[in-house]
Regions:
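Acidic-enriched catalytic cores of C-N bond-cleaving enzymes acting on peptides and small amides
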Residues: 141, 150, 171-223
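Active-site metal-coordination/substrate-binding segment of hydrolases
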Residues: 36-106
Length: 223
C-alpha cells in the first residue's frame, strides 16, 4: 500500500494493490497520450532477511544516513532504486516534461524467484502492455559512472540421478573396481564448465546470440 501511495503522490493516474497467487503486486500508471510510447518500470519491494539483527549498527527497517550512504535493508536491492524511479517520475510530471506513458509494476517475490509474476503477467497482459521495460534492479559500475544494463544472466535447474550398485559393497573388496556414484557425479559437475568458464554441455550455445562487435568495443572502453 505504501508504494501505491507514493505513486499517487508522484502523479500517477491510478495505483492499485492487486492480488496474485502469492504476495500482492502494485500496479500504477500515467497515460499522457494513448498514441505515445509506453515505458513499463519493474521493481520489487521484498528484501532478503535482515537477520542476524545484532550485526546491524542501526534498525534495518529504519533508514539511517551514515558517511553519505543510506543504510537499511533493501536500500541497494531494491527499494532504493525503486524510490529513485518514482521520484524521477514525479519530477517529470511536476515540470511537464513527461512525454511518454509510464506504467509501474512492483512485485513482492523476486528474492524467491518470482513464482507468481509470470501468471500475473499472463492474466493482465493488456494492462501491462508497453513498448519497453525498464528494470530498476541492476547495478552501477561506480558512483560517477551511470550504467545501462542490457542483459542479465539467467537460471537453469537440472536434477541428475546417478545410480550404482543396488546394495552396499565392501570398500576393501570393491573400492576402485566399482564406480562410486558420488565420484561419478563430482566428475560430471567438474566438467560442466571449462577453464575459461564456458559451459561445455553440447548444444547449450546453439540459440545464444553472439555479443555484437560494437558492444564489445564499448565494453572495452569501460574503466
Amino acid at each position: 500500500e505504501r508504494w501505491a501511495q507514493l505513486l499517487l503522490a508522484a502523479g500517477a493516474d491510478e495505483a492499485l494493490v492487486m492480488p496474485s497467487a502469492g504476495n500482492p503486486i502494485v500496479f500504477g500508471q500515467k497515460i499522457v497520450d494513448p498514441k505515445a510510447k509506453t515505458v513499463l518500470i519493474y521493481a520489487h519491494y521484498d528484501v532478503m532477511p535482515a537477520e542476524p539483527l545484532e550485526l546491524w549498527k542501526s534498525n534495518p527497517f529504519e533508514p539511517e544516513v551514515r558517511d553519505g550512504h543510506i543504510w537499511a535493508r533493501g536500500a541497494d536491492d531494491d527499494k532504493g532504486q525503486s524510490f529513485i524511479q518514482v521520484k524521477a517520475f514525479e519530477y517529470l510530471v511536476k515540470n511537464n516534461l513527461l512525454t511518454h506513458n509510464v506504467k509501474y509494476i512492483f512485485e513482492g517475490e523476486e528474492e524467491i524467484g518470482s513464482p507468481s509474476l509470470e501468471g500475473f503477467c499472463r492474466e493482465h497482459k493488456e494492462l501491462l502492455k508497453a513498448d519497453v521495460i525498464l528494470v530498476s534492479d541492476t547495478s552501477m559500475l561506480g558512483a560517477d559512472l551511470p550504467s545501462l544494463t542490457t542483459g542479465l544472466r539467467g537460471l537453469a535447474y537440472w536434477e541428475i540421478e546417478v545410480t550404482g550398485p543396488n546394495r552396499d559393497l565392501h570398500s576393501g573388496h570393491f573400492g576402485g573396481a566399482v564406480a562410486n556414484p558420488i565420484n561419478v557425479l563430482c566428475g560430471m559437475i567438474s566438467k560442466v564448465t571449462d577453464a575459461d568458464g564456458r559451459i561445455t554441455v553440447p548444444g547449450f550455445y546453439d540459440d545464444v546470440e553472439e555479443v555484437p562487435q560494437a558492444e564489445r568495443e564499448m565494453i572495452a572502453h569501460i574503466p
